[in-house]
A protein has these predicted regions:
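Extracellular carbohydrate-recognition regions
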Residues: 332-360
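N-terminal pre-catalytic segment of deacetylase/amide-hydrolase enzymes
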Residues: 25-129, 314, 318, 323, ...
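Alpha-helical scaffolding within the catalytic cores
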Residues: 49-54, 115-118, 141-146, 170-186, ...
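N-terminal Sec-pathway targeting helices
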Residues: 1-18
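Secretory/extracellular carbohydrate-interaction modules
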Residues: 372-434
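His/Asp/Glu-enriched short active-site or ligand-binding loop at hydrolase and phosphoryl-transfer sites
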Residues: 161, 220-225, 230, 255-259, ...
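Metal-dependent polysaccharide deacetylase catalytic core of the NodB/CE4 family, i.e.
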Residues: 67-74, 128-130, 150-267
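Carbohydrate-binding surfaces in secreted/extracellular proteins
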Residues: 396, 448-483
Length: 486
């Protein structure tokens, strides 16, 4: 009796081992087939640096930063790469350094659905939450990265070029991930998929002199016809490229795609041969997707945290995690860019970004000095990370200035779009600058003998109207505004 029972038991165990092995291989086969020696350094973190404990911050996030990566390369290959490759990608050691520095500082990733709910005002998230993203759908965005995510308890989003990924089955030598690999990634629970492009992630001929440019941001030059595609053709091509990318992912994986990253970060704002490119692209993407992602430099002085329920909460800023940043650098960049809460009191020039100005403190720490920078004839600076302020006033005591006028600025989008309270001898004005055009919305005469020092104040009242005053003289704008930096 014992022997047959033992044989059945042995057979059962053998079958369990066999099917268990097949199950593991089903999910791990792509990792095995695509293994490269430098991946060992990533997998070693699962043993030596595993840290899945999620330290939850009791404070609520006032905004969410989004980090952007592309490929993660072997250290030696990265060092010997071209300048453009180094600019776009990062090395494995640098990637590990940056992510582990973020984890040690208390930063945690969120899923794409968490981010979507946060931006629509449906969900609050802890402070020090961030969205981790990768572009293109390359194999070197996944295989050396996934073990590190696993060791940290992190998640990521992959924006894919559908023509490069979904149109082919698995191939060991392919630069891009296949549809089978993408499905395996999503099954892990660590990866979300979103749209980056269909066939428009490329360069096209943009002039009769064989000039080239990003396909999405440029009208194509037709050499046979000696003319550009018409605006109607360009508009249709832009819209179709976005619809195609969304449809391809939805048909393949059967979920709704709401997020899109502009190819090369270009939405017509630069390097375009057509003045209306930006408005056409922005209009098209808003028809197809709920959110579109662009790139911003952390050194621009602009707020790159993304905030819910703002006028631009569908237009998502991403910061490229440059390979030049140490782990401490990246942590410092994110921490220093956290939104500033009211009330705000000036303490040091480090709170101020010199857009086109040299910024320094008065020797006794009693104030701020702005001086012109380079060949500029004016000096301009903003309070860092103040874009979410509302129903506030900002007062600056002006002791002296050399020039024709001095202004306090609100709703600062960029140097071509803002509101200002401007004092010049004899007048106090509310100015609006929009797309390089400066207009005086309202003005009041003041005493010609009004002398400095004086308190110059700009504010945004609860009706979101600009309030401006100098001493006892004040004015209020007729129009309302949204968002911006102060």
């Amino acid at each position: 009796m014992f022997a047959p029972t033992r044989r059945y038991l042995d057979l059962t165990i053998a079958l369990l081992i066999l099917f268990g092995g097949l199950f593991v291989f089903h999910y791990a086969k792509f990792i095995v087939l695509n293994f490269k020696p430098y991946h060992l350094a990533a997998y070693w973190t699962l043993i030596t640096e595993r840290n899945t404990e999620r330290i939850l911050n009791s404070e609520k996030a006032q905004g969410i930063p989004v980090l952007l990566f592309h490929g993660v390369l072997p250290d030696d290959d990265f060092k010997n790469s071209s300048e453009s490759t180094i600019e776009t990608n990062t090395s494995l050691s640098k990637f590990k350094e940056q992510l582990y520095a973020l984890k040690r500082d208390g930063w945690n990733t969120i899923s794409l659905s968490d981010f979507q709910d946060y931006m629509s005002g449906k969900k609050e998230l802890p402070r020090k939450s961030f969205l981790l993203t990768f572009d293109d759908g390359r194999k070197d965005s996944f295989y050396p990265v996934d073990p590190i995510l696993q060791s940290l308890g992190y998640q990521a989003v992959l924006f894919i070029i559908t023509d490069k990924t979904l149109n082919h089955s698995y191939s060991e030598g392919s630069f891009y991930l296949s549809r089978e690999e993408l499905e395996s990634m999503m099954d892990s629970g660590r990866w979300d998929i979103a749209a980056h492009a269909s066939h428009e992630h490329t360069y096209v001929t943009t002039s009769d002199e064989n000039g080239t440019g990003v396909a999405l941001a440029n009208r194509i030059w037709n050499e046979d016809q000696k003319d550009y595609e018409t605006e109607s053709e360009y508009r249709d091509r832009v819209l179709k490229s976005m619809v195609d990318a969304k449809t391809a992912i939805q048909n393949q994986f059967n979920f709704v795609v709401s997020d899109y990253a502009f190819p090369y970060g270009n939405y017509g704002q630069r390097d375009s041969n057509y003045d209306n490119a930006e408005s056409i692209i922005r209009s098209a993407v808003d028809q197809v997707f709920s959110r579109s992602y662009y790139q911003v430099s952390p050194n621009s002085g602009l707020d790159f945290y993304n905030h819910p329920n703002q006028h631009n909460n569908r237009f998502i800023a991403r910061v490229k995690a440059s390979s030049e940043f140490s782990g401490e650098d990246l942590v410092s960049i994110l921490n220093k860019a956290e939104p500033v809460s009211l009330p705000f009191t000036y303490e040091t020039s480090e709170q101020i970004f010199g857009n086109w100005a040299n910024v320094s403190d008065v020797a006794d720490d009693s104030g701020l000095i702005l001086t012109t920078k380079d060949k500029n004839t004016s000096a301009f600076a903003t309070v860092k990370n103040s874009s979410r302020w509302s129903d506030y006033k900002f007062t600056a005591r002006v002791d002296e200035f050399n020039g024709q006028a001095i202004s306090l600025v609100s709703y600062f989008v960029n140097d071509q779009n803002y509101y200002a309270c401007t004092f010049s001898p004899g007048y106090l004005r509310i100015h609006k600058k929009q797309d390089e055009r400066l207009v005086a919305l309202k003005e009041v005469k003041i005493k010609s003998n009004q002398l400095l020092p004086a308190d110059l104040m700009i504010g945004l009242n609860n009706e979101r109207k600009i309030v401006c005053s100098l001493g006892g003289s004040g004015i209020i704008s007729d129009e309302t505004v949204d968002g911006g930096e102060s």
